Amino acid sequence: MPLPTNQLRLAMVAGEPSGDLLAASLLGGLRERLPESAQYYGIGGQRMIAQGFDSHWQMDKLTVRGYVEALGQIPEILRIRGELKRQLLAERPDAFIGVDAPDFNFSVEQAARDAGIPSIHFVCPSIWAWRGGRIKKIAKSVDHMLCLFPFEPAILDKAGVASTYVGHPLADDIPLEPDTHGARIALGLPADGPVIAVLPGSRRSEIALIGPTFFAAMALMQQREPGVRFVMPAATPALRELLQPLVDAHPQLALTITDGRSQVAMTAADAILVKSGTVTLEAALLKKPMVISYKVPWLTGQIMRRQGYLPYVGLPNILAGRFVVPELLQHFATPEALADATLTQLRDDANRRTLTEVFTEMHLSLRQNTAAKAAEAVVRVLEQRKGRA
Protein backbone atom coordinates (compact mmCIF):
# COMPACT_ATOMS: atom_id res chain seq x y z
CA MET A 1 0.00 0.00 0.00
CA PRO A 2 1.62 3.32 -1.03
CA LEU A 3 2.22 5.92 1.63
CA PRO A 4 0.25 9.17 1.51
CA THR A 5 1.72 12.07 -0.41
CA ASN A 6 0.81 14.54 2.32
CA GLN A 7 3.59 15.49 4.70
CA LEU A 8 4.96 12.71 6.90
CA ARG A 9 6.50 13.60 10.26
CA LEU A 10 8.80 11.23 12.11
CA ALA A 11 10.09 12.00 15.61
CA MET A 12 13.44 10.47 16.56
CA VAL A 13 15.78 10.46 19.56
CA ALA A 14 19.45 9.45 19.61
CA GLY A 15 21.20 9.84 22.94
CA GLU A 16 24.91 9.42 22.21
CA PRO A 17 27.42 9.49 19.31
CA SER A 18 26.97 5.81 18.39
CA GLY A 19 23.21 6.39 18.18
CA ASP A 20 23.77 9.50 16.07
CA LEU A 21 25.74 7.38 13.60
CA LEU A 22 23.04 4.69 13.42
CA ALA A 23 20.23 7.22 13.14
CA ALA A 24 22.03 9.11 10.38
CA SER A 25 22.33 5.92 8.34
CA LEU A 26 18.62 5.23 8.91
CA LEU A 27 17.73 8.78 7.88
CA GLY A 28 19.70 8.32 4.66
CA GLY A 29 17.69 5.19 3.89
CA LEU A 30 14.38 6.86 4.75
CA ARG A 31 15.10 9.88 2.58
CA GLU A 32 15.49 7.52 -0.40
CA ARG A 33 12.13 5.83 0.30
CA LEU A 34 9.81 8.49 1.72
CA PRO A 35 8.44 11.62 0.07
CA GLU A 36 10.88 14.52 -0.11
CA SER A 37 8.50 16.58 2.03
CA ALA A 38 8.84 14.20 5.02
CA GLN A 39 10.05 15.90 8.20
CA TYR A 40 12.36 14.41 10.84
CA TYR A 41 12.75 16.03 14.24
CA GLY A 42 13.51 15.36 17.92
CA ILE A 43 16.94 14.94 19.54
CA GLY A 44 20.02 14.10 17.52
CA GLY A 45 23.66 14.84 16.78
CA GLN A 46 25.62 16.41 13.97
CA ARG A 47 25.45 13.40 11.63
CA MET A 48 21.65 13.40 11.87
CA ILE A 49 21.50 17.15 11.37
CA ALA A 50 23.59 16.73 8.20
CA GLN A 51 20.78 14.47 6.91
CA GLY A 52 18.23 17.26 7.34
CA PHE A 53 17.17 16.39 10.90
CA ASP A 54 15.75 19.16 13.11
CA SER A 55 17.18 18.66 16.61
CA HIS A 56 15.12 20.49 19.24
CA TRP A 57 17.53 19.66 22.11
CA GLN A 58 21.28 19.07 22.30
CA MET A 59 22.07 15.35 22.16
CA ASP A 60 24.92 15.60 24.68
CA LYS A 61 22.37 16.47 27.38
CA LEU A 62 21.42 12.77 27.30
CA THR A 63 24.92 11.26 27.13
CA VAL A 64 25.65 9.52 30.43
CA ARG A 65 27.49 6.38 31.53
CA GLY A 66 27.14 4.22 34.61
CA TYR A 67 24.63 4.11 37.44
CA VAL A 68 26.42 6.33 39.94
CA GLU A 69 27.86 8.82 37.45
CA ALA A 70 24.43 9.61 35.97
CA LEU A 71 22.86 10.85 39.20
CA GLY A 72 23.82 14.49 38.72
CA GLN A 73 22.22 14.61 35.26
CA ILE A 74 18.88 13.03 36.16
CA PRO A 75 16.86 16.25 36.75
CA GLU A 76 17.81 17.74 33.37
CA ILE A 77 17.17 14.46 31.55
CA LEU A 78 13.74 14.06 33.17
CA ARG A 79 12.84 17.65 32.22
CA ILE A 80 13.77 17.06 28.57
CA ARG A 81 11.90 13.76 28.48
CA GLY A 82 8.77 15.37 29.90
CA GLU A 83 8.88 18.18 27.34
CA LEU A 84 9.42 15.69 24.52
CA LYS A 85 6.43 13.56 25.59
CA ARG A 86 4.19 16.61 25.71
CA GLN A 87 5.36 17.66 22.26
CA LEU A 88 4.70 14.19 20.82
CA LEU A 89 1.20 14.01 22.23
CA ALA A 90 0.41 17.51 20.97
CA GLU A 91 1.86 17.08 17.46
CA ARG A 92 1.15 13.34 16.94
CA PRO A 93 3.86 12.40 14.43
CA ASP A 94 3.39 9.39 12.15
CA ALA A 95 5.87 7.38 14.24
CA PHE A 96 8.41 7.73 17.02
CA ILE A 97 11.82 6.10 16.56
CA GLY A 98 14.09 5.71 19.58
CA VAL A 99 17.69 4.95 18.66
CA ASP A 100 19.47 3.07 21.44
CA ALA A 101 19.41 5.01 24.81
CA PRO A 102 16.75 2.60 26.19
CA ASP A 103 16.56 4.15 29.66
CA PHE A 104 15.43 7.40 28.06
CA ASN A 105 13.57 6.13 25.02
CA PHE A 106 11.42 3.32 26.43
CA SER A 107 9.40 5.76 28.52
CA VAL A 108 8.86 8.01 25.50
CA GLU A 109 8.01 5.01 23.32
CA GLN A 110 5.43 3.77 25.81
CA ALA A 111 3.79 7.22 25.93
CA ALA A 112 3.71 7.29 22.12
CA ARG A 113 2.32 3.77 21.86
CA ASP A 114 -0.37 4.44 24.47
CA ALA A 115 -1.44 7.44 22.39
CA GLY A 116 -1.68 5.37 19.20
CA ILE A 117 1.60 6.60 17.72
CA PRO A 118 3.69 3.66 16.37
CA SER A 119 6.87 3.21 18.39
CA ILE A 120 10.01 1.78 16.81
CA HIS A 121 13.26 1.09 18.64
CA PHE A 122 16.58 0.81 16.79
CA VAL A 123 19.16 -1.35 18.64
CA CYS A 124 17.82 -4.07 20.87
CA PRO A 125 19.06 -3.69 24.45
CA SER A 126 21.20 -6.55 25.70
CA ILE A 127 18.27 -8.65 26.92
CA TRP A 128 20.47 -11.67 26.25
CA ALA A 129 23.06 -10.46 28.76
CA TRP A 130 21.05 -9.12 31.71
CA ARG A 131 18.67 -10.57 34.25
CA GLY A 132 15.41 -8.90 35.21
CA GLY A 133 12.28 -7.70 33.46
CA ARG A 134 13.72 -5.52 30.70
CA ILE A 135 12.04 -7.60 28.00
CA LYS A 136 8.67 -6.95 29.69
CA LYS A 137 9.38 -3.22 29.45
CA ILE A 138 10.15 -3.65 25.75
CA ALA A 139 6.85 -5.49 25.21
CA LYS A 140 4.96 -2.60 26.83
CA SER A 141 6.80 0.13 24.95
CA VAL A 142 7.85 -1.03 21.50
CA ASP A 143 5.73 -1.86 18.45
CA HIS A 144 8.72 -2.89 16.34
CA MET A 145 12.39 -3.52 17.18
CA LEU A 146 15.23 -3.11 14.67
CA CYS A 147 17.90 -5.64 15.69
CA LEU A 148 21.63 -5.43 14.98
CA PHE A 149 22.40 -9.05 15.85
CA PRO A 150 20.92 -12.22 14.31
CA PHE A 151 19.99 -14.03 17.54
CA GLU A 152 17.82 -11.20 18.92
CA PRO A 153 14.54 -11.64 16.94
CA ALA A 154 13.96 -15.16 18.33
CA ILE A 155 14.22 -13.83 21.90
CA LEU A 156 11.85 -10.96 21.15
CA ASP A 157 9.38 -13.22 19.36
CA LYS A 158 8.89 -15.24 22.56
CA ALA A 159 7.84 -12.00 24.29
CA GLY A 160 5.46 -11.06 21.47
CA VAL A 161 7.59 -8.18 20.17
CA ALA A 162 7.71 -7.73 16.38
CA SER A 163 11.24 -7.26 15.08
CA THR A 164 13.48 -7.17 12.02
CA TYR A 165 17.13 -8.21 11.86
CA VAL A 166 18.89 -5.43 9.95
CA GLY A 167 22.56 -6.27 10.52
CA HIS A 168 25.22 -3.88 11.77
CA PRO A 169 26.28 -0.82 9.75
CA LEU A 170 29.91 -1.29 10.75
CA ALA A 171 29.89 -4.59 8.88
CA ASP A 172 28.70 -2.75 5.76
CA ASP A 173 31.32 -0.03 6.08
CA ILE A 174 34.43 -2.06 6.96
CA PRO A 175 36.07 -4.06 4.13
CA LEU A 176 36.37 -7.82 4.58
CA GLU A 177 40.15 -7.57 4.17
CA PRO A 178 41.65 -4.61 6.07
CA ASP A 179 44.57 -2.74 4.52
CA THR A 180 47.12 -2.81 7.35
CA HIS A 181 49.97 -1.58 5.14
CA GLY A 182 47.94 1.38 3.87
CA ALA A 183 46.87 2.30 7.39
CA ARG A 184 50.48 2.35 8.56
CA ILE A 185 51.44 4.63 5.70
CA ALA A 186 48.53 6.94 6.56
CA LEU A 187 49.71 7.20 10.18
CA GLY A 188 53.43 7.44 9.40
CA LEU A 189 54.18 4.13 11.10
CA PRO A 190 56.92 1.74 9.95
CA ALA A 191 55.76 -0.91 7.49
CA ASP A 192 57.52 -3.63 9.49
CA GLY A 193 57.63 -4.41 13.19
CA PRO A 194 54.89 -5.04 15.74
CA VAL A 195 52.24 -2.38 16.36
CA ILE A 196 49.69 -2.47 19.17
CA ALA A 197 46.67 -0.16 19.18
CA VAL A 198 45.54 0.94 22.64
CA LEU A 199 42.04 2.35 23.16
CA PRO A 200 41.31 3.29 26.80
CA GLY A 201 37.92 4.91 26.10
CA SER A 202 36.67 8.35 25.19
CA ARG A 203 35.20 9.72 28.43
CA ARG A 204 36.97 11.50 31.26
CA SER A 205 35.79 8.91 33.80
CA GLU A 206 37.05 6.04 31.63
CA ILE A 207 40.49 7.58 31.19
CA ALA A 208 40.73 8.31 34.92
CA LEU A 209 39.88 4.72 35.84
CA ILE A 210 41.76 2.65 33.29
CA GLY A 211 44.21 5.06 31.62
CA PRO A 212 47.04 4.69 34.17
CA THR A 213 46.71 0.89 34.06
CA PHE A 214 46.85 0.80 30.27
CA PHE A 215 49.94 3.04 30.20
CA ALA A 216 51.68 0.89 32.82
CA ALA A 217 50.85 -2.18 30.73
CA MET A 218 52.34 -0.49 27.65
CA ALA A 219 55.56 0.20 29.56
CA LEU A 220 55.81 -3.47 30.52
CA MET A 221 55.14 -4.59 26.95
CA GLN A 222 57.87 -2.33 25.60
CA GLN A 223 60.34 -3.84 28.09
CA ARG A 224 59.42 -7.37 26.97
CA GLU A 225 59.07 -6.60 23.24
CA PRO A 226 61.61 -3.80 22.62
CA GLY A 227 60.68 -3.21 18.97
CA VAL A 228 56.97 -2.70 19.62
CA ARG A 229 55.23 0.55 18.74
CA PHE A 230 51.92 1.79 20.10
CA VAL A 231 49.20 3.86 18.47
CA MET A 232 46.40 5.50 20.46
CA PRO A 233 43.54 7.49 18.88
CA ALA A 234 42.28 10.60 20.68
CA ALA A 235 38.77 11.35 19.44
CA THR A 236 38.84 15.03 20.42
CA PRO A 237 41.37 17.71 21.44
CA ALA A 238 39.90 17.50 24.96
CA LEU A 239 40.70 13.79 25.10
CA ARG A 240 44.25 14.38 23.87
CA GLU A 241 44.67 16.97 26.62
CA LEU A 242 43.35 14.45 29.14
CA LEU A 243 45.87 11.83 27.96
CA GLN A 244 48.84 14.21 27.95
CA PRO A 245 49.83 13.79 31.65
CA LEU A 246 49.96 10.02 31.12
CA VAL A 247 52.05 10.49 27.99
CA ASP A 248 54.41 12.82 29.86
CA ALA A 249 54.78 10.27 32.66
CA HIS A 250 55.95 7.61 30.17
CA PRO A 251 58.39 9.42 27.82
CA GLN A 252 60.10 6.14 26.92
CA LEU A 253 57.06 4.77 25.09
CA ALA A 254 57.19 4.51 21.30
CA LEU A 255 53.69 5.97 21.12
CA THR A 256 51.83 7.75 18.33
CA ILE A 257 48.64 9.56 19.32
CA THR A 258 46.31 10.23 16.41
CA ASP A 259 43.60 12.86 16.10
CA GLY A 260 40.58 10.58 15.85
CA ARG A 261 40.93 7.96 13.10
CA SER A 262 40.40 5.12 15.54
CA GLN A 263 39.53 2.70 12.73
CA VAL A 264 42.74 3.55 10.88
CA ALA A 265 44.72 3.09 14.10
CA MET A 266 43.20 -0.35 14.69
CA THR A 267 43.71 -1.32 11.05
CA ALA A 268 47.42 -0.50 11.37
CA ALA A 269 47.82 -2.72 14.44
CA ASP A 270 48.83 -6.35 14.87
CA ALA A 271 46.96 -6.57 18.19
CA ILE A 272 44.68 -4.32 20.22
CA LEU A 273 44.22 -3.53 23.91
CA VAL A 274 40.73 -2.06 24.17
CA LYS A 275 38.14 -0.94 26.68
CA SER A 276 34.88 -2.85 26.40
CA GLY A 277 32.27 -1.30 24.11
CA THR A 278 31.17 -1.14 20.48
CA VAL A 279 34.78 -0.56 19.46
CA THR A 280 35.47 -4.23 20.25
CA LEU A 281 33.09 -5.21 17.45
CA GLU A 282 34.94 -2.82 15.15
CA ALA A 283 38.21 -4.53 16.11
CA ALA A 284 36.68 -7.93 15.34
CA LEU A 285 35.45 -6.76 11.93
CA LEU A 286 39.03 -5.61 11.27
CA LYS A 287 40.11 -9.22 12.09
CA LYS A 288 42.43 -8.15 14.91
CA PRO A 289 43.50 -10.19 17.96
CA MET A 290 42.59 -8.21 21.06
CA VAL A 291 42.36 -8.06 24.83
CA ILE A 292 39.16 -6.53 26.22
CA SER A 293 39.20 -4.72 29.55
CA TYR A 294 37.33 -2.23 31.67
CA LYS A 295 37.23 -0.68 35.10
CA VAL A 296 34.18 1.07 36.54
CA PRO A 297 33.56 2.51 40.03
CA TRP A 298 33.05 -0.15 42.71
CA LEU A 299 29.31 0.42 43.19
CA THR A 300 28.62 0.43 39.44
CA GLY A 301 30.61 -2.79 39.15
CA GLN A 302 28.61 -4.46 41.93
CA ILE A 303 25.30 -3.57 40.26
CA MET A 304 26.53 -4.84 36.89
CA ARG A 305 27.82 -8.08 38.42
CA ARG A 306 24.49 -8.82 40.09
CA GLN A 307 22.45 -8.08 36.96
CA GLY A 308 24.56 -9.90 34.41
CA TYR A 309 24.42 -13.59 33.70
CA LEU A 310 26.58 -14.09 30.60
CA PRO A 311 30.19 -14.98 31.42
CA TYR A 312 31.52 -12.40 28.94
CA VAL A 313 31.00 -8.70 28.20
CA GLY A 314 32.85 -8.17 24.91
CA LEU A 315 30.77 -8.23 21.73
CA PRO A 316 33.18 -10.57 19.88
CA ASN A 317 32.74 -13.19 22.60
CA ILE A 318 28.98 -12.62 22.87
CA LEU A 319 28.52 -13.05 19.11
CA ALA A 320 30.76 -16.12 19.02
CA GLY A 321 28.97 -17.62 22.03
CA ARG A 322 32.29 -18.43 23.64
CA PHE A 323 35.55 -16.81 24.70
CA VAL A 324 37.50 -16.18 21.50
CA VAL A 325 39.49 -13.26 22.96
CA PRO A 326 40.49 -12.67 26.60
CA GLU A 327 38.63 -10.31 28.93
CA LEU A 328 40.32 -8.77 31.97
CA LEU A 329 37.85 -6.74 34.01
CA GLN A 330 37.92 -4.71 37.21
CA HIS A 331 40.59 -5.96 39.68
CA PHE A 332 41.79 -8.56 37.17
CA ALA A 333 42.88 -5.70 34.88
CA THR A 334 46.39 -5.27 36.29
CA PRO A 335 49.28 -3.94 34.18
CA GLU A 336 51.02 -7.32 34.38
CA ALA A 337 47.94 -9.30 33.31
CA LEU A 338 47.12 -6.90 30.47
CA ALA A 339 50.71 -6.94 29.20
CA ASP A 340 50.92 -10.75 29.31
CA ALA A 341 47.59 -11.25 27.54
CA THR A 342 48.22 -8.61 24.85
CA LEU A 343 51.70 -9.93 24.02
CA THR A 344 50.26 -13.43 23.75
CA GLN A 345 47.68 -12.12 21.27
CA LEU A 346 50.48 -10.38 19.37
CA ARG A 347 52.78 -13.42 19.12
CA ASP A 348 50.40 -16.37 18.64
CA ASP A 349 50.18 -16.86 14.87
CA ALA A 350 47.94 -19.94 15.08
CA ASN A 351 45.45 -18.03 17.22
CA ARG A 352 45.59 -15.14 14.73
CA ARG A 353 44.60 -17.46 11.89
CA THR A 354 41.74 -18.93 13.93
CA LEU A 355 40.46 -15.48 14.87
CA THR A 356 40.57 -14.35 11.24
CA GLU A 357 38.26 -17.24 10.32
CA VAL A 358 35.90 -16.59 13.25
CA PHE A 359 35.76 -12.84 12.64
CA THR A 360 35.27 -13.23 8.87
CA GLU A 361 32.25 -15.48 9.46
CA MET A 362 30.94 -12.92 11.98
CA HIS A 363 31.48 -10.11 9.47
CA LEU A 364 29.54 -11.87 6.71
CA SER A 365 26.65 -12.59 9.08
CA LEU A 366 26.38 -8.94 10.13
CA ARG A 367 26.77 -7.46 6.63
CA GLN A 368 23.12 -6.89 5.66
CA ASN A 369 22.94 -3.36 4.15
CA THR A 370 21.63 -2.04 7.44
CA ALA A 371 20.49 1.41 6.30
CA ALA A 372 18.27 -0.08 3.58
CA LYS A 373 16.84 -2.89 5.73
CA ALA A 374 16.10 -0.59 8.66
CA ALA A 375 14.45 2.01 6.43
CA GLU A 376 12.34 -0.66 4.71
CA ALA A 377 11.16 -1.94 8.11
CA VAL A 378 10.14 1.57 9.17
CA VAL A 379 8.25 2.07 5.91
CA ARG A 380 6.38 -1.21 6.51
CA VAL A 381 5.32 -0.01 9.96
CA LEU A 382 4.05 3.24 8.43
CA GLU A 383 2.16 1.33 5.74
CA GLN A 384 0.57 -0.95 8.35
CA ARG A 385 -0.56 2.10 10.30
CA LYS A 386 -2.11 3.62 7.19
CA GLY A 387 -3.85 0.31 6.49
CA ARG A 388 -5.44 0.37 9.96
CA ALA A 389 -6.44 4.03 9.76
Swiss-Prot record:
GO cellular component, one term: membrane
Broad EC category: transferase
Entry keyword Lipid biosynthesis: yes
UniProt key word Signal: no
EC number: 2.4.1.182
Keywords for the protein's UniProt record, in alphabetical order: Glycosyltransferase, Lipid A biosynthesis, Lipid biosynthesis, Lipid metabolism, Transferase
Reactions listed under catalytic activity: a lipid X + a UDP-2-N,3-O-bis[(3R)-3-hydroxyacyl]-alpha-D-glucosamine = a lipid A disaccharide + UDP + H(+)
A single GO BP: lipid A biosynthetic process
Pathway: Bacterial outer membrane biogenesis; LPS lipid A biosynthesis
InterPro entries found in the cross-reference section: Glyco_trans_19
GO molecular function: lipid-A-disaccharide synthase activity; phospholipid binding
Family: Belongs to the LpxB family.
Function: Condensation of UDP-2,3-diacylglucosamine and 2,3-diacylglucosamine-1-phosphate to form lipid A disaccharide, a precursor of lipid A, a phosphorylated glycolipid that anchors the lipopolysaccharide to the outer membrane of the cell.
PANTHER family linked: LIPID-A-DISACCHARIDE SYNTHASE, LIPID-A-DISACCHARIDE SYNTHASE, MITOCHONDRIAL-RELATED
Protein name: Lipid-A-disaccharide synthase
Protein's organism: Burkholderia cenocepacia (strain ATCC BAA-245 / DSM 16553 / LMG 16656 / NCTC 13227 / J2315 / CF5610)
